[in-house]
Amino acid sequence: METQQSRFLQYITRGSLVQQILLGLAAGIILASLSTQAALAAGLLGTLFVGALKAVAPILVLVLVMASIANHQQGQKTNIRPVLFLYLIGTFSAALIAVVLSVLFPSTLALNAQAADITPPSGIVEVLEGLLMSVIANPIHALLNANYIGILVWAVGLGIAFRHGSGSTKSMINDASNAVTMIVRVVIRFAPLGIFGLVASTLAETGFGALWGYAHLLMVLIGGMLLVALVVNPLIVYWKIRSNPYPLVLRCLRESGVTAFFTRSSAANIPVNMELCRKLNLDEDTYSVAIPLGATINMAGAAITITVLTLAAAHTLGIQIDVPTALLLSVVASLCACGASGVAGGSLLLIPLACSMFGISNDIAMQVVAVGFIIGVLQDSAETAVNSSTDVMFIAAVCHAEDAKLAEKERLNLL
């Protein structure tokens, strides 16, 4: 009996997290189909899990980045620039894919929804201004409000300052980083219970009946995201590593994308991505900075959402869009997507900004936003899964490419 209990505990604490998450997913679907009331009650597990991830993510980013920079050795490469380049290429490519799909399969919206009582940003300048204000945020406010741009700036600043500290100070910061990482691993082990609660409560609250009216729009949105995740991203990774990208792509989708799909929060998925980078044996100096940065600016899914819904509104109103305008929309959508994390409501509230390019009034644009909220159960989940899994994917591609370069240099030196 004790042996069976120890085996069960070992499976819970050390077993495959992906298998456990799939079990939680299946259990959530079964519970929602059997008892709506019980499924709603189980939602507390999901709320607690997402809350725990959001609670630990800001302090994790602060301590990890600070420790990484404080203990950084002179001359050691961090590879942030090539990672940023891939982030921008990936986001712009996603916007282009969304334009092509919207032209090939134009969607029409029933624009009769009530305009939401929310205020979108008035222009791209306001979005950029919001990002700049995030940079100079009070560090306590940045931690409390999960302002990752502000947290990164303070972490980098403190890390540089601590590089001039004593060895014992650096050691203490490193120990703090290890302690927070250990807490994160404990939280992540509760992912199956969290996913179980999230799936059960979501299905009990909304079901999928409300989504059928927007089936065509959802097919274009989800199709675009699948195309980016399974075709465009692998091509970018292949260009970087010059070998089969799919083992890496599928692992990132499985271990990062699945969790992100159900938490629907790039910030909450930061600890999951950090743990996956550690498992992939990537350079900590690179991923400790690039993961929180990716959660802020690497927004391929958001670029697709903004582009598809904006073009759907234009098509509904009979507005003709030429190729140069479509390309300009791709650029604007990419810039908007990079600022999505700094706007309450994310990518949906940046749709009016893109709609203004075509002279679409704010009232109609806000009705498009309302449609976005209706389909958000799937749209937001898929968007977050693409955004978050791409962060790890591109970091891994850059790290593998750099490792290959170093190996080639060593080989040539030996000849």
Swiss-Prot record:
UniProt keyword terms in alphabetical order: Amino-acid transport, Cell inner membrane, Cell membrane, Membrane, Symport, Transmembrane, Transmembrane helix, Transport
Topology of the protein relative to the lipid bilayer: Multi-pass membrane protein
Localization terms from the record: Cell inner membrane
GO biological process: serine transport; threonine transport
Stretches that traverse the bilayer: 21-41, 45-65, 85-105, 142-162, 193-213, 217-237, 289-309, 331-351
MF terms in GO: neutral L-amino acid:sodium symporter activity
UniProt cross-references to Pfam families, sorted A to Z: SDF
Reactions listed under catalytic activity: L-serine(in) + Na(+)(in) = L-serine(out) + Na(+)(out); L-threonine(in) + Na(+)(in) = L-threonine(out) + Na(+)(out)
General function of this protein: Involved in the import of serine and threonine into the cell, with the concomitant import of sodium (symport system).
Similarity field: Belongs to the dicarboxylate/amino acid:cation symporter (DAACS) (TC 2.A.23) family.
Protein name, UniProt field: Serine/threonine transporter SstT
UniProt organism field: Pectobacterium atrosepticum (strain SCRI 1043 / ATCC BAA-672)
Gene name of the record: sstT
